[in-house]
Amino acid sequence: MENIFITIVCIALIILGGVSYATSALNSVDKLTVSWKAAEAYAQETRETDVKAISSETYDNGSNIDISLENNGDQSLVNFDKWDVIVRYQDGGATWIPYSTSTPGWSITGIYYNGQPEVYEPNIFNPSETMTINIRLSDGVTENTTNLATISTYNGIHSQIPFGW
């Protein structure tokens, strides 16, 4: 009789252990699936993003630069505070410019569709739109130099354009 009791307890422990193991395995697979889907969504968004710098204009003794960008991708772009703007100078130095209305800083001066200010989804950089940003530098760029501005979206797609004064 004692052996039957011990056998039943052992079988119950084996079943409990198997169920516990299976539950842990299923939870792990579920977490992996969620992570995989998130990574795939991010990769898809990145594949569908294409931004191109098309023109630059420098003024105010080299301390202000206007850059026009085109959204040639299939993604509407937002989160401008998570974008990076980096100015690399001809002398080798580089500066990260924050998204700010102060100096140094960069801000959006307009988003346009076919040359007209946007009316559909304001403050969202939609496909086929053009956006103009203004970069304000603490110290203007040196005359007769060629410098490089790099604009990078929140998902890592970037475009570069030279500018000078």
Residue ranges and their predicted role:
Residues 1-52:
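Membrane engagement elements in two modes
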Residues 26, 30-33, 137-165:
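Terminal connector regions
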Residues 53-60, 108-111:
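Short amphipathic beta-strand and strand-loop transition segments with alternating hydrophobic
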Residues 63-65:
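Structural beta-strand segments of beta-rich domains
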Residues 68-74:
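Asparagine-centered strand-capping/turn motif at beta-strand->loop junctions
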Residues 74-79, 141-143:
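A short beta-turn/strand-edge loop motif at beta-sheet boundaries
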Residues 76-125:
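The feature marks short-to-medium sequence segments in extracytoplasmic or secretory-pathway proteins
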Residues 129-135:
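Short strand-edge motifs at loop-to-beta-strand transitions and within beta-strands
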